[in-house]
Amino acid sequence: MRNACLAFLLICLASLVSALEIEDHRFFPGTGERVLHVISTADLDVFEPYLEAFQSSQPTLSIDYTVVSSTELYSAIRNGAAFDLALSSAMDLQFQLANDGFATSHRSEATAALPDWARWRDLIFAFTAEPAVVVLSTERFQGLDLPTTRQELVTILRDHPERFEGAVGTYDVRDSGLGYLFATQEARATDAYWRLSEVMGRLNPQLYCCSGQMIDDVADGRLALAYNVLGSYAADRLARDSGGRVQILGMQDFTNVILRTAIIPSSARETAGAGALIDMLVRLGQREAPGNWPLPPLGYTGTDSRVDFGPIRLGPALMVYLDPLNRRAFLTEWENALEQR
């Protein structure tokens, strides 16, 4: 009977996989018949320690973990895909799902202990606070002063076009939900965003969907710098880079900080397992320091007191740039700045 159920599960999974652009996938077998289906934007090498820790306390529960882009995740949940838990760094898209009725409420002692700014109506829960950073190639910047503000970065790029031609990476915000969130929030916070975008646009910038690939391309020498990537991913890559090829910079004028969030989709079946994983994540999220975990907890912004951190608030204001007219206007301005060739 169990084999028949597993066979049916695999058939259903195969049809689901064919409908999604999956970046990675892994099945963590438990000793029982229950399966927790997780859809997430977090790379496996970053999130695997959390899944292993959770499964050690829930050994009978199997975990089916699927990695997709934030926009794929949003579409999957909105279309009723059979996932029990959705974890995303694109907090605006997560909030939109919760606001539009695609999330199920969850209440526990762990979620009740979260500050008000880290949860909304028992539907969406933040468990990390992750800054956007600049990752640069130490070789490509040899002989140059390292920028500490966007204006200094503008000056360096403008004064050395031959060094940075085709070697600047950033998000393609048309496809990346996280990239769009970073861009819109930064544009609201500082006029320097558009000045920097225009200078990048003259240098034939390379556009990406994800932080991980940008960081790898800096480490491999294909890029001189990657702009607005997740600091947690950059720190993980830096820890594995023994050659000193990569350096992380936080802009001192302003640094966006996103909250990675969790929701239980309204289509979820394994709500008990989903709630238990949320509880573990939010408990870890209330630590004072990262410790041995890859992702930084809520409220932790590192040790550099010179950096002006600007946390993006969890609330209805997140949906302003998701309005179709606002989105189209922003993307038009972004394309004019970044695609000048």
Locate the predicted segments by residue:
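A bilobed periplasmic-binding-protein/Venus flytrap-type ligand-binding module shared by bacterial periplasmic
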Residues: V133-R140, A183-T184, I258-E270, A289-N292
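Extracellular/periplasmic bilobal clamshell ligand-binding domains
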Residues: S305-R341
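Short beta-strand->loop
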Residues: A103-A112, L123-A126, A239-N256, P265-S267
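Early extracytoplasmic/lumenal segment of secretory-pathway proteins
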Residues: A19-Q96
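Extracytoplasmic ligand-binding site segments that recognize negatively charged/polar headgroups
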Residues: T41, E48, I77, A90-Q94, ...
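Short amphipathic alpha-helical coupling segments at ligand-binding clamshell hinges
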Residues: Y50, A192, L196, R269-L281, ...
